[in-house]
Amino acid sequence: MLFDQIARNKRKTWLLLLVFFLLLGLVGYGVGYLWLGSGFGGMILALVIGFIYAVTMIFQSTNVVMAMNGAREVDEQTAPNLYHVVEDMAMVAQIPMPRVFIVDDPSMNAFATGSSPKNAAVAATTGLLAVMNREELEGVIGHEVSHIRNYDIRISTIAVALASAITMLAVMARNMMFWGGGRRRNDDDRNGSSGLEIILLIISLIAIILAPLAATLVQLAISRQREFLADASSVELTRNPQGMINALLKLDNSAPMQHHVDDASAALFINDPKKESGLQKLFYTHPPISERVERLKQM
């Protein structure tokens, strides 16, 4: 099952690229048409920027994501308990030893990043290390190592990178629309536009408004099932379902993280780092803890 999931994740990587670059292209077309005088020129520029940003994030994802979350790298001497658990789980999973980081935050959470098992990293908060016992910590780290082994991290990294690029470009475009201006404003230009240009303009303007939401929904579409698989894979590594269940129950009672967590990188964490409520729950990247626990009990 795991090998099939790895193959599916690789296919999803290309599907994600197509969807996100389509959104980038549509937003870029609107910006280019209205402010650069060339819709297709804006589309090409947006795609080039998005491609460079995505490639940079993929190959620099570990350093970028760790810096965004204020993580510091540790080793066997500075954090022996965490280091040894990561080492053990990586050995069982038969992947290279990931780099190990700690985030100074009293909440309980952990995440992994990196484009492949060869350049991955695992991070845990000080709150998690203070509360979890050895079996629970193994469950959490096993979950993160499973993300690495199943190539979930590559999908998440691409989603984080391109969702951030789309959101940034869409926000810039909306600000430009709000303040007015632009080079493509006169009637002569508009009267000379072809029907295809008008249709693309309308679609791109809609994309400018909806792109951040669409990018979030794409992340949601792949994130929740990925969490279920990582929970099950962690139990496969530890042979201790109760340890994973106990860890999830403790995570469910954890407070939100105190430091700011970027919306795009929130999906990387084992538990929702913001603990939002109300309608915002509709956009959770993680399934409810209670549902995750029930699935583990059925194993």
UniProtKB/Swiss-Prot annotation:
Membrane topology annotation: Multi-pass membrane protein
EC number(s) on file: 3.4.24.-
PANTHER family in the record: PROTEASE HTPX
UniProt-annotated catalytic positions: 144
Subcellular location: Cell membrane
UniProt keyword annotation of Metal-binding present: yes
GO cellular component assignments: plasma membrane
One Gene Ontology biological process: proteolysis
Lineage: Bacteria, Bacillati, Bacillota, Bacilli, Lactobacillales
Designated name of the protein: Protease HtpX homolog
InterPro entries documented for this protein: HtpX_protease, Pept_M48_protease_HtpX, Peptidase_M48
Molecular function terms from GO: metalloendopeptidase activity; zinc ion binding
Keyword tags: Cell membrane, Hydrolase, Membrane, Metal-binding, Metalloprotease, Protease, Transmembrane, Transmembrane helix, Zinc
Listed cofactors: Zn(2+)
Main location: membrane
Record-annotated disulphide pairs: none
Residue intervals passing through the bilayer: 14-34, 39-59, 153-173, 198-218
Record family assignment: Belongs to the peptidase M48B family.
Binding site for Zn(2+): 143, 147, 227
Entry-linked HAMAP family: Pept_M48_protease_HtpX (MF_00188)
Cofactor detail note: Binds 1 zinc ion per subunit.
CDD domains linked: M48B_Htpx_like
